Design a protein with these regions (language model features):
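Non-catalytic terminal accessory/regulatory regions of metabolic enzymes
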Residues: 1-97
């Protein structure tokens, strides 16, 4: 199986109100207050083993840029991983913006 792993985060300098809320909640609950807390999205998409990695990666890059990511406020990283039957993982492609 091929698995796409996409991580979407706010660009540095963009206010992250959800991250601020989590940091304050941690403090209120008695946990150590972090210096910084940034929230984001994590997406996994699975494809058949016989998918061609280079064309799949290019298609997924377009999915990120046209559907999943707001280029004004967010950035992303994209990894394409082959997962063998025994669970062994091999990173095939990686990129981001």
């Amino acid at each position: 199986m091929l698995q796409a792993r996409i991580r979407v985060t706010l660009k540095s300098g963009i206010l992250d109100p959800q991250g601020v809320t989590v940091a304050h909640a941690m403090d209120s609950l008695g946990f150590r207050h972090p210096d910084n807390c940034r929230m984001g999205k994590y997406i996994e998409l699975s494809y058949p083993e016989d998918s061609e990695p280079a064309s799949l990666h290019e298609e997924l890059r377009k999915v990120c840029e046209r559907l999943l990511v707001n280029p004004n406020t967010e950035t992303y990283s994209l990894s394409l991983v082959r997962i063998a039957a025994d669970g062994t993982e091999t990173v095939l492609e990686g990129s981001g913006r």
